[in-house]
Amino acid sequence: MNSIVNITPIIIILSEHSSEHTFGFNSDIFEANVINILLLLFGLIYVLKQSLGSTLNERQLKVLAAIQESEERLEQASSRLSESEKQLAQTQIIINQIKKEAQLTAEKVRSSILAQGQIDIERLAITGKSNIETAEKQIRRQIQQQIAFLALKKVTLQLENQMSSDIQLRIIDNNIAKLGDQL
């Protein structure tokens, strides 16, 4: 407020001086301010146009370059995203195929194991029957041998009891004669 009071005498002196001379301060506020503002504005535009213009042009070019670079990055990111989505879809297809193949393989293995188990059971049954038949034959043979042995023993005992030395000599001579004819 104090500076406004000090300026007032200066304005009065300038206005008195302007009435005496052709160049001076115009006390009409509307007329003087519009011209002064226009002069100041044109002066600023003229002075700052070149430096601000080149700075603004550089800034505009940088902004446009940044926008273009961002758009390129967005386009690259979009293409990478679409490529990744394609790869994901292909991977899902491959995973599904692998799962199907694994299920088929598991089913084949299970069927093969069951079939092999059935074959093994049949083979064991046949082997068991064969072993039983072999054991029966062996037991029959042993029984037959035992019967033959007992029969021979009984016949031998009977012959020893019933056979005299004359009969034994006749049998020996008869067998020797048969052997002599064959030679």
From Swiss-Prot:
Annotated coiled-coil segments of the chain: none
Predominant cellular place of this UniProt entry's protein: plastid
Signal sequence coordinates: none
Topology with respect to the bilayer: Single-pass membrane protein
The disulfide bonds in this chain are none
Question: Where does this polypeptide localize?
Answer: Plastid, Chloroplast thylakoid membrane
Question: In the UniProt record, does the keyword Plastid occur?
Answer: yes
InterPro entries given for it? ATP_synth_b/b'su_bac/chlpt (IPR002146)
Q: What family does the database annotate?
A: Belongs to the ATPase B chain family.
Q: Any further remarks?
A: In plastids the F-type ATPase is also known as CF(1)CF(0).
Tell me the subunit arrangement.
Answer: F-type ATPases have 2 components, F(1) - the catalytic core - and F(0) - the membrane proton channel. F(1) has five subunits: alpha(3), beta(3), gamma(1), delta(1), epsilon(1). F(0) has four main subunits: a(1), b(1), b'(1) and c(10-14). The alpha and beta chains form an alternating ring which encloses part of the gamma chain. F(1) is attached to F(0) by a central stalk formed by the gamma and epsilon chains, while a peripheral stalk is formed by the delta, b and b' chains.
- Any idea what this protein is called? ATP synthase subunit b, chloroplastic
What's the name of its gene?
atpF
